[in-house]
Amino acid sequence: MELTPREKDKLLIFTAALLAERRRARGLKLNYPETVALITAALMEGARDGKTVAELMSEGTRILGRDEIMEGVPEMISNIQVEVTFPDGTKLITVHNPVV
């Protein structure tokens, strides 16, 4: 199977997000990479489901709460930017202060 660099990146994000979901389900607090991966994957899947950029930017701040993340991690993430594919093309989504 031949994958483009972009496809490899998507798979890496998905794998990290899957690990984060499992740890979250066990009640563990997420670290920085897990937090970013989980939010990024949710944005990518939302675009796949047909949501708009505005909807995803709004929903991106409600995916995780401070109580689910290790201390200090929310302050490390001022915004998350991800380029996702929509039916009408690729767009950049920016979520400011994703963990409030």
From Swiss-Prot:
Its EC number is 3.5.1.5. It holds the Pfam family Urease_gamma. This is Urease subunit gamma. It catalyses: urea + 2 H2O + H(+) = hydrogencarbonate + 2 NH4(+). It comes from the Bacteria. Pathway: Nitrogen metabolism; urea degradation; CO(2) and NH(3) from urea (urease route): step 1/1. The gene is ureA. It is found in: Cytoplasm. Keywords: Cytoplasm, Hydrolase. PANTHER family: UREASE. It is an enzyme of class 3 (hydrolase). InterPro entries: Urease_gamma, Urease_gamma/gamma-beta_su, Urease_gamma_sf, Urease_subunit.
